From Swiss-Prot:
It is an enzyme of class 6 (ligase). This is Arginine--tRNA ligase. One of its GO terms (molecular function) is arginine-tRNA ligase activity. One of its GO terms (biological process) is arginyl-tRNA aminoacylation. It comes from Rhodopseudomonas palustris (strain HaA2). InterPro entries: aa-tRNA-synth_I_CS, Arg-tRNA-ligase, Arg-tRNA-synth_N, Arg-tRNA-synth_N_sf, ArgRS_core, DALR_anticod-bd, Rossmann-like_a/b/a_fold, tRNAsynth_Ia_anticodon-bd. It holds the Pfam family Arg_tRNA_synt_N. Monomer.
Amino acid sequence: MPDQTTSTHLFAHILARVHAVCAALTDEGALPTGTDLSRIVVEPPKDASHGDMATNAAMVLAKDAKAKPRDLAEKIAEKLRAEDQIDTVSIAGPGFINLTLKPAVWAEALRAVLDAGAGYGRSRVGGAEKVNIEYVSANPTGPMHVGHCRGAVFGDALANLLETAGYDVTREYYINDAGAQVDVLARSAFLRYREALGEDIGAIPEGLYPGDYLVPVGTALVAEHGAALKELPEPQWLPMVRAKSIAMMMEMIKADLAALAITHEVFFSERSLIEGERNRVADTIDFLRAKGDVYQGRLPPPKGAPVEDYEDREQTLFRATAYGDDVDRPLLKSDGTYTYFASDIAYHKVKFDAGFGNMVDVWGADHGGYIKRMQAAITAVTSGKGALDVKIVQLVRLLRNGEPVKMSKRSGDFVTLREVVDEVGSDAVRFMMLFRKNDAVLDFDLAKVIEQSKDNPVFYVQYGHARGHSIFRNAKELFPDLPDATEARIAFLKDANAERLTDPSELDLLRRLALFPRTVEAAALAHEPHRVAFYLYDLASEFHALWTRGRDLPHLRFIINNDAEITKARLAMVQGVVSVLASGLAILGVTAPDEMR
């Protein structure tokens, strides 16, 4: 739940009034001095018919007051009824307090949207805290596939969201360039190198990467080395081919990400942990050993299903069980090289030492079992001062009209991210990847996401923004001086008499606009950008519904030619909708078109 004390939006204002009421009750002796008010929240009620806002104040403070929740609720409600902005107060169930605000509050809320302009929804809740978000981090062994796409979009949108909420965000990509898979990449590229020299390589052997995307690597190796590599033994050519292959794969990956407008500030090489000026992995193991968290020991045989990294031998172990894990974890393999886990601990220590006490990792669904050990390691290596939130991104099922999509010839065994973006566009990909919670499997239908219908959420939301601009264009007849530029148009509409907006559907739309800053804060604190996508769809739905009502009921049309005052008020409301849709879409990394083409 957001720390609403750092917020300036309407919900935070009402929370402040609830706090003031509790302070008054403390003065009267109904609450003890020093009562913790941080547990109080003000939020939309689950049932909109109960009012505009609800608070749990009586429920969480009743024990302190040594009173029944409902009795305390009566005392709080009595004082809240005296507040200028509150119309009615009711008590539900055991002691929940429901509030209905006066209509004038919603007119004022619209003015707040216009006054803030593009800044509406921005927050200081993050307090400029440094946050490192590591996402994508696909192995540098080929082009991005559609599965990578979801994690890429999620991580980028989360970074945008946290920046909007006032965090200092660094976007990072961890290059897995030290494992066996990059040696396989090098051998696969060397085969393409021989092919580029004119050799018939036949079928790609089992265990190597078969995709055509390595053909340009072979060509580049010939341009750089001629036939010289062919005469060298593998231990000599492999490091050179590996480095070239990784570099070209990363350029391909960066180009794929650019198609979705995704960039990273930091690309961190796993290999640099070991081959840099210092061996960071060895340093980290020594650091943990000095704390008593690394020891030489033999793990007991696993119970039930086999553990993938179990070996019946004495080995170097991290005392993960001391930090909540189920079993202690090996740091060295039988051949003396580091486990991936050891490198991962060192990598996160590097981030923590750089000032990132708040770290977010975006992982694929197949890494879910890795979370507990990694969080144990973070607690140990940061002495409890660092926090790691792992967001699991579930699988994407790619469909066309409900049928699974066939694999790509270019990649050999998967559909590439670029193929999907080229077919349906970046906006459709980004919005739909965020229109479901990250830990739920997503069906992505290539045919559905380009439909121009309510059933296509990205179209429906973007159309809301375009429809608003269409209304502005049509209003020129009544208001010839209505500016086209956003800031000038907002300035023109600021003196609109928003109190004329009295229809229940208009007030519902204003309530929805007032909810946006709180939605942003709650989504940021929960690391859940899908909440913004859901909000935008609901806002667009209410806006479209109001437009449709105006078609059937002339007095509700946005433009009333013989009533300039109500028209200007409704244009101000439309501007509020357009501004919030644009701000929300920007968080998701989706464009807000003025016209749909």
